[in-house]
């Protein structure tokens, strides 16, 4: 892992959690390394942490710190080199009529209801399946960096104009956009909203002249996390260094 002494984070403290059941790989235990205190993790500091493999969940900033497993690999897409695949171009064309609204962080009941439906459909029985409003707000609406809510709604020529289809939370940092969390309408299983969201974020990063889109952790053996490798060229943080992630050099 990147040595913390190499980072300008002398005022932060770091601790390791006790082992807990892994959310992604069955019969595995996990640990996290947590950065604290949260009130000192502003945009510049969080950018350094992100480059060292950390992510945030609300005001909680962490990275995998497992004793033996190295399955979680922090990832980022090289924005200016990205070329969409055929299926990604189809998703882009399919949803070109969606209207996009970029908002400041704030609670909206419509967002929360979509979040609940998404969790019940896609992650039934998971840690977030029963999140109440307070848990939802702590997870997605608390931030000390430049964060935004992105709404995707049906356009005026769709059968249901204005219908909320997807919500994405993003952080806009000095070196890139970090995709925090996305949830969407699951009523159409072939909708490919998630793919369209990543393509939209890539385009926004390109517009802002930002070199990277950070997608979080890639886990080869997890269906929930393995899709990220489809967005190339991608870099992964392996053995303390960002390097091209092509599939052949990934931990099993």
From Swiss-Prot:
Reactions listed under catalytic activity: N-terminal L-glutamyl-[protein] + L-leucyl-tRNA(Leu) = N-terminal L-leucyl-L-glutamyl-[protein] + tRNA(Leu) + H(+); N-terminal L-aspartyl-[protein] + L-leucyl-tRNA(Leu) = N-terminal L-leucyl-L-aspartyl-[protein] + tRNA(Leu) + H(+)
InterPro entries reported in the protein's UniProt record: Acyl_CoA_acyltransferase, Asp_Glu_LeuTrfase, N-end_Aminoacyl_Trfase, N-end_Aminoacyl_Trfase_C, N-end_Aminoacyl_Trfase_N
Paired cysteines (S-S): none
Gene Ontology, cellular component aspect: cytoplasm
UniProt-listed Enzyme Commission number(s): 2.3.2.29
Subcellular location: Cytoplasm
Alphabetically ordered keywords of this record: Acyltransferase, Cytoplasm, Transferase
Molecular function via GO: arginyl-tRNA--protein transferase activity; leucyl-tRNA--protein transferase activity
Protein's GO biological process: ubiquitin-dependent protein catabolic process via the N-end rule pathway
Domain of life: Bacteria
Protein family: Belongs to the R-transferase family. Bpt subfamily.
Function field: Functions in the N-end rule pathway of protein degradation where it conjugates Leu from its aminoacyl-tRNA to the N-termini of proteins containing an N-terminal aspartate or glutamate.
Protein name: Aspartate/glutamate leucyltransferase
Organism: Polynucleobacter necessarius subsp. necessarius (strain STIR1)
The encoding gene: bpt
């Amino acid at each position: 892992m990147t040595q913390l002494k190499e980072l300008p984070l002398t005022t932060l403290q770091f601790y390791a959690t006790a082992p807990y059941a892994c959310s992604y790989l069955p019969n595995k235990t996990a640990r996290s390394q947590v950065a604290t205190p949260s009130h000192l993790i502003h945009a510049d500091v969080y950018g350094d942490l992100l480059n060292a493999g950390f992510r945030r969940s609300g005001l909680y900033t962490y990275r995998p710190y497992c004793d033996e497993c190295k399955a979680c690999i922090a990832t980022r897409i090289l924005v200016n080199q990205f070329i969409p695949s055929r299926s990604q171009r189809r998703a882009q064309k399919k949803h070109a009529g969606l209207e996009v609204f970029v908002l400041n962080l704030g609670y909206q009941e419509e967002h929360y209801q979509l979040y609940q439906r998404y969790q019940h459909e896609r992650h039934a029985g998971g840690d977030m399946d029963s999140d109440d409003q307070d848990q939802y707000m702590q997870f997605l609406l608390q931030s000390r960096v430049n964060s935004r809510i992105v709404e995707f709604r049906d356009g005026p020529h769709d059968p249901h104009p204005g219908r909320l289809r997807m919500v994405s939370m993003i952080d806009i940092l000095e070196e890139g956009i970090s995709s925090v969390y996305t949830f969407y309408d699951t009523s159409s299983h072939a909708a490919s909203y998630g793919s369209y969201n990543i393509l939209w974020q890539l385009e926004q990063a390109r517009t802002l002249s930002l070199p990277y889109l950070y997608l979080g952790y890639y886990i080869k053996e997890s269906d929930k996390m393995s899709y990220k490798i489809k967005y190339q060229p991608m870099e992964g943080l392996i053995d303390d260094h960002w390097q091209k992630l092509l599939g052949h050099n990934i931990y099993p």
